[in-house]
């Protein structure tokens, strides 16, 4: 389970508030995970545990899934403030 210490922190990286950055963030995370899986070749158990955690986070639709934005989840109120997000 040594390889999980490199995979689990990826789930804690927050998604940006600005919707314009969601695509680039998801592409970066996808390429990072793909390159990690190809280079490090984690054991089967670690890969299954990580994929199960990723599936549960994305299935729960709490807004932390980096693959897509759930339509039912709402953005924080600060996301609509132009002073914080910028133009």
Curated annotation (Swiss-Prot):
SMART domains, alphabetized: BC10
One GO term of the biological process aspect: apoptotic process
InterPro entries documented for this protein: BCALP
Bilayer topology term: Multi-pass membrane protein
Keywords on record: Apoptosis, Cell cycle, Cytoplasm, Membrane, Nucleus, Transmembrane, Transmembrane helix, Tumor suppressor
Entry's transmembrane regions: 19-39, 43-63
GO cellular component: cytoplasm; membrane; nucleus
Primary location recorded for the protein, binned into one broad class: cytoplasm
Localization, UniProt: Cytoplasm; Nucleus; Membrane
PANTHER family named among the record's database cross-references: BLADDER CANCER 10 KD PROTEIN HOMOLOG, BLADDER CANCER-ASSOCIATED PROTEIN
Quaternary data: Interacts with RB1 (phosphorylated and unphosphorylated). Interacts with STAT3; the interaction is promoted by cell stimulation with IL6 and phosphorylation of STAT3.
Function: Acts as a tumor suppressor; induces growth arrest at G(1)/S checkpoint and apoptosis via RB1-dependent and p53/TP53- and NF-kappa-B-independent mechanisms. Modulates expression of genes involved in the regulation of proliferation, cell cycle and apoptosis.
Name this polypeptide is given: Apoptosis inducing factor BLCAP
Species of the source: Didelphis virginiana
Protein encoded by which gene: BLCAP
């Amino acid at each position: 389970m040594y390889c999980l210490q490199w995979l689990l922190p990826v789930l804690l990286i927050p998604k940006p508030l600005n919707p314009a950055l969601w695509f680039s963030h998801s592409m970066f995370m996808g390429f990072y995970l793909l390159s990690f899986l190809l280079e490090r070749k984690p054991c089967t158990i670690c890969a299954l545990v990580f994929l199960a955690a990723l599936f549960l986070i994305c299935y729960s639709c709490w807004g932390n899934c980096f693959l897509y934005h759930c339509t039912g989840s709402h953005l924080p109120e600060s996301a609509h403030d132009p002073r914080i997000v910028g133009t």
